[in-house]
A protein has these predicted regions:
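Membrane-integral, polyisoprenol-dependent glycosyltransferases
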Residues: 1-326, 461-488
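Membrane-embedded architecture of ER/inner-membrane glycosylation machinery
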Residues: 157, 269-493
């Protein structure tokens, strides 16, 4: 049953992957910018909606380009590599658990704990830098661990190369996170290893290889790039108001359904002095500690520590300690999520067939309580991908607006304006630049919020969401109440 669940999770990662429109605003940046990269052949300078976008290095765009090349410029192609790298990260975590414990069973439990955690799964279904960043950092740490434990010298340069790839996703943090984890671990366990010159030579090479894009942009864009780099990397260190415990509190939601089990697992590792889990413990503590000290706190920042959380949680579940307590936690998780699913189906008027799945975690609990949280995770995924998001998709009309614009101006010869609001996914679906914050000129196509532009009559109207789709729960609540929706017209001016 354990391996059946793992195969089912792998299947769920790709089912309905392309069924949902591009999420606005974040995913839209990568969807449109990569489409333009394939058109103009410039894979170094990302342009979103005709404007240079230097917020992140190009690796995420390149990954999307691979998906587009394989499956076409569509939602499935947009997200394919992210789903693949999400599973890849879980697979590497499985291999790491096997390396640490010698048990494939521990590996598969780690695979399930990571791949089914809510935040990690959600980001694996969504084109953004977080999953590629986590993948390359996890790969870097795994290759280093193999080098250190088995003495395979050729793996050390590969570990640093993986760190360079992480830098091409999100900049210097791609070096700081794996290097800091290894440094602290060796400082505590084997300080003499830190005296080896190879680490410092490879660090210089990794930084040169990983930061070439930033160097190129400094040389070619100068102050423009420095301004963006400061905002994206340095300003966040001191500009923010969240409390220092923000990430530990957020973990209760982001690592569901295993979050309730993780905190006792962490306590268990510390009390029992499980030396084989010293490495994931340092990994978790360093990343959570570092980002807790940074002023601006965003939940996905600590996602590179999630494989460590999965390793610690799976070890606790498979141990023979605290059996009654673990059974209690597993039952509570199953009960709470089952009640939440029941509430969601009734509250959002979803397909009642979802309710037929509610007994499954409890049936699995009777067979093996350790598998119940995985079944709970699968239940959450099914609820999201086959009930909640399809119901929400009915209220997302930006793709229809884009198709209508292409019908009005098939040759893309007219400028297109949006007045009264800007929908970030519209440039992708209209396949052209959308001019914003400007007075429309004659001979143009205008998308406008009704009563914000009175110089032409709409040929067709659409009801569109005006909030951020990235805040999914708020979007769901707004959709239910028809809140933050407005009527938009499209006209030939």
């Amino acid at each position: 049953m354990l391996y059946v669940l793992a195969l089912l999770v792998a299947l769920l990662y790709f089912l309905n992957l392309g069924a949902f429109q591009v999420w606005s605003p974040n995913e839209a940046f990568y969807a449109d910018s990569t489409r333009r990269m394939l058109q103009n052949g410039d894979f170094i300078n990302p342009y979103y909606n005709g404007e240079l976008r230097l917020n992140k290095p190009p690796m995420t765009y390149w990954l999307v380009a691979i998906g587009y090349s394989l499956f076409g410029v569509n939602e499935f192609g947009l997200r394919f590599m992210h789903a693949l790298l999400g599973l890849g990260t879980a697979f590497i975590t499985m291999l790491m658990a096997k390396e640490l414990t010698g048990s494939w069973k521990a590996g598969v439990y780690s695979f399930l704990a990571l791949s089914l955690s809510v935040q990690f799964f959600a980001n694996s279904q969504y084109a953004s830098p977080e999953v590629p960043f986590t993948f390359f950092i996890t790969l870097s740490l795994y290759l280093w661990l193999l080098y250190y434990k088995r003495g395979y010298l050729f793996l050390l340069p590969l570990a640093f190369f993986a760190s360079s790839l992480a830098m091409l996703v999100k900049g210097p943090a791609g070096f700081v996170l794996p290097a800091g984890t290894v440094f602290i671990y060796l400082l505590l366990k084997d300080p003499r290893e830190l005296l080896k010159l190879r680490y410092y030579i490879l660090s210089v090479l990794a930084l040169l290889l990983g930061l070439w894009w930033q160097a190129y942009q400094i040389f070619t864009k100068g102050g423009l790039f420095w301004e963006v780099f400061y905002k994206e990397n340095l300003r966040r260190v001191y500009h923010g108001s969240e409390p220092i415990y923000f990430y530990l509190a957020d973990l209760n939601v982001s690592f569901l359904p295993y979050s309730l089990i993780f905190f006792p697992a962490l306590l268990w590792v510390l009390i029992k002095l499980k030396r084989e889990y010293a490495f994931p413990l340092v990994w978790f503590a360093f990343i959570y500690g570092l980002f807790s000290l940074i002023a601006q706190k965003i939940p996905v920042y600590v996602m590179p520590a999630f494989p460590a959380l999965a390793l610690i949680t799976s070890a606790f579940l498979l141990s023979e300690d605290w059996e009654r307590f673990k059974k209690f936690l597993s039952f509570v998780v199953s009960l709470l999520v089952a009640l939440a699913v029941l509430f969601a189906v009734l509250f959002f008027s979803l397909n009642p067939l979802i309710l037929t799945l509610l007994p499954l975690p409890f049936l699995l609990f009777l067979r093996d309580y350790r598998l119940a949280p995985a079944m709970v995770g699968i239940l959450i995924v099914v609820l999201l991908k086959f009930a909640l998001l399809p119901s929400l998709e009915e209220k997302r009309k930006v793709r229809e607006v884009g198709e209508f614009i292409k019908m009005l101006d098939a040759k893309a010869s007219k400028p297109v304006y949006e007045v009264g609001h800007f929908h970030h996914s519209l440039p992708f679906y209209a396949e052209r630049r959308i001019i914003r914050d400007s007075q429309p000129e004659r001979g143009s196509v205008v998308v406008f919020r009704l009563n914000s532009f009175n110089d032409c009559e709409p040929v067709r109207t659409f009801r569109l969401y005006t909030g951020s789709e990235s805040r999914l729960f708020k979007f769901l609540m707004d959709a239910r109440k028809d809140k933050n929706f407005a009527d938009f017209g499209v006209c030939l001016y």
